[in-house]
């Protein structure tokens, strides 16, 4: 954390096909070893499949899926007098998006389908219907926060 003034977040260029900053961030999360063009191909192919499946606009379906995965609360470890408590804290909007995207990509990578584009399309489809591994991850995080609600007064 800086002592003088807060750092402005870097501006991210919107993606070339849909003009969405959120989708550009998602492409960056999916990217491996700096191979952005491959990541773009995978995401656009997955979004085309998703749009055909849901019958909605591709970007609209993507945002609906991301909405169902974004966490609202999470737990952070806090040490108090020799014991460690899992303290529930609210998640900032930027971190909400980042966690949701990361969970979707991780869940897609763990799936057993043929190509990454198909795995991503299936995971996004499941997420838009409130099922799948990414949604389960969010439910687990929310359950942990609910179970540790008694320690909420240790927030900082």
From Swiss-Prot:
Q: Does the keyword Cytoplasm apply?
A: no
- Pfam families in the record, alphabetically? Ribosomal_S7
Gene Ontology process terms (BP): translation
The record's Gene3D superfamilies line, in alphabetical order, gives: Ribosomal protein S7 domain
InterPro entries per record = Ribosomal_uS7, Ribosomal_uS7_bac/org-type, Ribosomal_uS7_CS, Ribosomal_uS7_dom, Ribosomal_uS7_dom_sf
Q: Which GO terms describe its cellular component?
A: small ribosomal subunit
Entries under CDD domains matching the protein: uS7_Bacteria
Q: Which PROSITE patterns match?
A: RIBOSOMAL_S7
Protein keywords: Ribonucleoprotein, Ribosomal protein, RNA-binding, rRNA-binding, tRNA-binding
The domain of life is: Bacteria
One Gene Ontology MF term: structural constituent of ribosome
Q: Which family does it belong to?
A: Belongs to the universal ribosomal protein uS7 family.
**Task of the protein:** One of the primary rRNA binding proteins, it binds directly to 16S rRNA where it nucleates assembly of the head domain of the 30S subunit. Is located at the subunit interface close to the decoding center, probably blocks exit of the E-site tRNA.
Complex formation: Part of the 30S ribosomal subunit. Contacts proteins S9 and S11.
Q: What is this protein called?
A: Small ribosomal subunit protein uS7
Q: Which organism is it from?
A: Pasteurella multocida (strain Pm70)
């Amino acid at each position: 954390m800086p002592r003088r003034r807060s750092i402005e977040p870097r501006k991210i260029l919107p993606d070339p096909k849909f003009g969405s900053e959120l989708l550009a961030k998602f492409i960056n999360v999916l990217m491996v070893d700096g191979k952005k063009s491959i990541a773009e191909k995978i995401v656009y192919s997955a979004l085309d499949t998703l749009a055909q499946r849901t019958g909605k606009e591709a970007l609209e379906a993507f945002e609906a899926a991301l909405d169902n995965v974004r966490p609202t609360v999470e737990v952070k470890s806090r040490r108090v007098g020799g014991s460690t408590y899992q303290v529930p804290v609210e998640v900032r909007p930027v971190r909400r998006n980042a966690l949701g995207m990361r969970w979707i990509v991780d869940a897609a990578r763990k799936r057993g389908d043929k190509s990454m584009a198909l795995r991503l399309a299936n995971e996004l489809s499941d997420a838009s219907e409130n099922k799948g591994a990414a949604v389960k991850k969010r439910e687990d995080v929310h359950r942990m926060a609910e179970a540790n609600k008694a320690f909420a007064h240790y927030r900082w």
